[in-house]
Amino acid sequence: MARGNPRKRAAAAKDKWKMKEWYIVYAPDFFGSKEIGLTPADDPEKVIGRVIETTLKDLTGDFTKGHVKLYFQVYDVKGQNAYTKFKGHTLARSYIRSLVRRRTTRVDGIFNITTKDGYKLRVMGMVIAYRRIQTSQERAIRKIIQDIIYKKAEELNFADFVLQSVNGQIASEIAKEARKIYPIKRAEVRKIKVLAEPSA
């Protein structure tokens, strides 16, 4: 089947690209409304719904937070500015692999929670113990992860829960309690996913 003149196709593609404009993408207010990237589109409606990935290091300048990946979704465009809401976060796989070594125990917990202001989230907590631990100790540590995450959800609104998760405050509380059961290497809130926002 004929494909047409390659030069014409290239020229058409070039013209289409020229028609696109660049939109500046901003993080939500609770991340300081900082610029997190640029995205091109020939229609502002096409920008809405796009998901932008960045890291906590890029937002804060803290070089120890390069492994914390953040995801923001565009929900509104005004002029050349695109505004986002937080969709989730995760830790880089390479970072998690660096924590999980031979003869350690990884304790995971996955919980569906509702924040004080009605956001429904799926939260994954993780504790790494220095040695192989007993099943009873593993259960006790998982219960600690669960109790602290649920307690924080009851106390905090969505923005504060997210910030305390990504900056390590909730993980520090988990680590403090888990060490009463067994010496641990690290505690993390390794993933958050927004399941639903409160109805208007």
UniProtKB/Swiss-Prot annotation:
Keyword presence, Cell division: no
Domain of life: Archaea
One term of GO molecular function: structural constituent of ribosome
Keyword Ribosomal protein: yes
Coiled-coil ranges (or none): none
GO cellular component: cytosol; ribonucleoprotein complex; ribosome
GO terms (BP aspect): translation
Keyword list, A-Z: Ribonucleoprotein, Ribosomal protein
Family as reported in the entry's similarity comment: Belongs to the eukaryotic ribosomal protein eS1 family.
Subunit structure comment from the entry: Part of the 30S ribosomal subunit.
Protein name: Small ribosomal subunit protein eS1
Native source organism of the sequence: Thermococcus kodakarensis (strain ATCC BAA-918 / JCM 12380 / KOD1)
Gene (UniProt): rps3ae
